[in-house]
Amino acid sequence: GTEYYKLAAGKAKEVIDGVENHIYNYALLDEYSQVYSWEYNNKNKELLLGIYYNRDQTNQAAPLTDFLQDMAQGGWGDTNGEIKFWKAFPEGPRKDATYFPKIILSDGELHDWWYDTDPPSREVVAPVFMKTVEGAVRGTEFDYTNPALVNAAGEKTLQLIRLSQVYCWYAEATGRSGEVNTKAIEVLNKVRNRADGQETNFYKETMTPEALAEAAYDEHGWEIAGYYWGGIASRARDMFRMYRYKDHFEYRKENPLIKVAEGIERNEAVPVTGTWDDSKMYAPYPYEDAILNPNLK
């Protein structure tokens, strides 16, 4: 309800005030390309909560999860971007740093993600996220033009909460509380200006509370797109909170073709079937627990 959004806005405002009053030593990085870079891996000043790794001691397993299996660098194909979301994603430095600009397949050539052979042979044709990747040589930036195999043992910091997310949460919670204020517009524009790579100041104080809330909801989704390792507050959690899985389920069942380039249309390789019920929003209880306690349903 509205009262909880007011509490959320108040808590986010505490963080924002702490940053602005130099109580907390956090700030947005200047460029979005720096956020998930190796250069700022251990000195990301907008990271409020992270899990740090050194693969000489303990590694994480993220580097190969987003590569498609037919990519030259050696991928696991655990994830891929959704075409509709990619299409709606505003152009600019944020989008450029979120997705592979080009992908290298087994032929050693650079291709747009929507490339396929004639006749079609690729199992998955989809946008590819580029946030968890690490350089083929340890301690270097990832180069998407380099076909060298990437080590599966990663040591990039897993970023759970960033300051830009707090800005989005404050703006959304303010809007869902039925309000619009100068600070909410200001911090949301900080996020969008960096994403655009210029001072667009896209959002105005003339917005309605509903428009502000939806804008902040969208900005948060774009800000953390493809980064499911930040599971505390992924885009999926936003969709769950707003009860938007059902509509998206129905859209994915339709699976329409989407224009991705001149004369080229693509749709999702993974079909969605069946009839919606709210149980689809939840993971099932582990079998071992369910057989011990029949009340778990």
Regions found by a protein language model. Give the residues of each.
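Short coil/turn linking the two alpha-helices of tandem helical-hairpin repeats
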Residues: 1, 176-179
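Hydrophobic alpha-helical scaffolding
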Residues: 1-5, 85
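C-terminal structured "cap/appendage" subdomains that terminate the fold
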Residues: 184-257
